[in-house]
Amino acid sequence: MRYSTQQDVLDFVEDNNVKFVRFAFCDIFGTQKNIAVLASDLPKALEDGVCFDGSSIAGFMKVEESDLVLRPDLPTVTILPWRPTEGRVMQFFCDVEKPDGDPFGGNCRGFLREMNRRFRKLGLTCNVGAECEFYLFENDDRGRPTRVPIDFGGYFDVAPLDAGENLRRDICLTMEQMGMSPQHSHHESGNGQNEIDCHYAGPLKTADNVMMFKQIVRAVAMRSGIHASFLPKPLADQAGSGLHINLSLYMDGRNLFEGDIAPDSIAGSFMAGVLAHSRALTVFTNPLPNSYLRFGSDEAPKYVSWSRQNRSQLVRIPQVQGDNCRMELRSPDPACNPYLAIGLILAAGLDGIERRLELQAPINKNLFDPAVAAGLGLEKLPSTLEEAVQAAQESDFLRTVLPEELSHRYYEEELKRCAALKNAADPAEYERIHYFNAI
């Protein structure tokens, strides 16, 4: 059932013995936040929204103008099945607005919604899928995370090398309970590394799914005494974790990525736009200092290029048929804000379409081989977070698509991250506390 009215939601609360309601949102970096109300106060919260102090959320508001309001997106209502069945807990994803009802520039869900609306205005339907990788680590005898992976398995391994199969099953079943559609789950190439993919959906639904997926993984892992980490590169000698973003475009019921892609076609121009702005987007798709340790190895790209099938490329076109035809962007990682990341990828593609950019020839070479890559003269992705911030600040494109207030605060906070890590007495310990334990 689609819950589209306040009465639908109130009936759902009564039918499901809900006693506690979470209003969930995220800051501009993709860190999930929430405020909860008792079910008895829900009618007023639905009518008036829930006020909160925006100055206490990183990148949101100044102290002197701090009030913001959460407005729940009613169709996103869901029960949290890992919470008690007596006095259940349910959750909405929310949009953030100003007290007078005006849009708030830091409302990243709203930014993604607007990008999707612009595609629809052109007669284009965009579907997005996400492939999310993560690590599972043992906790010590005091329940604190360690960097000891739960197994020493590799790609597609099974028990006894794979110790995460039962946990992945529990995650997938929980996803189904919450209205999500898991597609594939398997052990990844790193020790203790796993991947679960979701079926494609609209851009906003997929971004919501990424946020919910991370919440589910952490909850199910914690219940089993295991620490789940979405840090892009938690182990120096193992593969990094990516959040590969798959996109397809439809016009008049036809998948524009199916078959040959002409350089000046809509699909070709979309890809050309993504490639043209990929350096500027990197600070949003890869937001941590740790993110840049992943690039250039273990199927994580380093150069701005595309190809078919080739996993050393930034963008690849998988060799599939029908509705599965798509482009895959391989640089994003799970630490990103999915609303901003997907929204900006769409904006870059749209810029390519509107400017009729032509897709350059594919690079059908193994770019993980330094000797091969060195001779091609390809543009590189930023190699550090500081370089990524600079690339974004120099981008005329980003100045036109992002609210100035949001971009300024985002860059400012990112540079603070860089400085804090550099100035830490023990950078490894700083990363453990602030990123490994939290991302």
Model-based region annotation:
Residues 1-439:
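Glycine-rich, acidic/polar active-site loops that bind/position phosphate-bearing ligands
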